[in-house]
Amino acid sequence: MRIRNFNEGLVLKTIEENSSISRADIGKIVGLTPPTISAIVKDLIERDIVQEIGKGDSSGGKKPTLLKINSKAAYMVAVDLGGENGIRVALMDLSYNIVKEKFDSKIESLNSQKLKNSLSVILKDFIKEINIPKEKILSICIGVPGIIDNKLKKVTVAPYLNWEISLEDLTLKEIGIPISLENDVNLMALGEKTKGIAQKINNFVFVGERTGIGAGIIINRKIYKGANNAAGEVGYLLIDPKYAPKSTRDNGCLEKLASYKVILEKAREKMGKNIRVIDVFKMAAEEDSVALGIVKETLKFLAYGIGNISCILDPELVIIGGGISILPKKFLEEIKMNIQEIIPFVPKIEFSKLGEDGVLIGAAVKVLEPLKKKGLILINSK
């Protein structure tokens, strides 16, 4: 059975790495005999893991039947705790598509214990609602704004939200689905690497303008986390000594100058208490003078942060994501002009096209990509 599973893994991995492929071409790549390939593929089709999708081209003779992975053969659940809309939960398929999602309460209003209780209830209810067999849900991945201690499976620093959370606190053991935590901006970087504008880029930085400000650093197509999992905590960059944090638990300087919270404070003072960050960005795009002033000031400080990052990493590309990415492209020129004030070389800069979906997509990538590379998805499902 082990040999069969190993061969199955080879076949699955090969189909996954090719958008469509014939049985004969699989055999050429993995070195298995045609009868072995046919038997494995027949079993995978019967288990609804692989699909036949039509005929391919032929250089002579019978046209081959093409195969692909069934993206609905298995799923994972992605959770985003770092956006303006509160807790966002989504069911993701094997192609990193959002199948179903729901929103819940704003997490800024929840203390640590209430967050744990709320998140546990939301996840349990969501898994009931989607009505999918548990064996088809490979994992749950929670994107959080903060530093993750992987050994303790715990968020240790999340100053803007003023809470800590550990997987053990979530009381989800009875669900029977593996759960992991990851920094939300790291997940956005993974999303860009796989389904965004960095699919062909080896080294890039994703700067997330969200509840706080963070950076996901991709080096040689892999997330760089640093010795203490704190790489990319650019919210602590010192942009102006007047805004230096008073303690290590305080919000960082760049976050005090350019985060969602700061934008909201300025906007609500000048534009009304009910305005949202996304509204400010939309109004700035429409040339509203008050919103434009707030956004331009934010972009200036964000640009200084990107300039500092570029001096250290010299990335091929810097992607700016979060709600701010809905701004028109002309605002990128504003950022570049501000960077030119402080450094002699300006990196290529783009706004993300994934928006807030990047966290959910990245969570799916984090869970599924390692499994796909090993060809292990659903090998033991019957």
Where are these regions (language model features)?
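Phosphate-binding/catalytic loop of phosphoryl-transfer enzymes
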Residues: 79, 86, 138-249, 362, ...
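ATP-binding/phosphotransfer module of carbohydrate and carboxylate kinases, centering on a glycine-rich
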Residues: 1-61, 66-103, 108-136, 175, ...
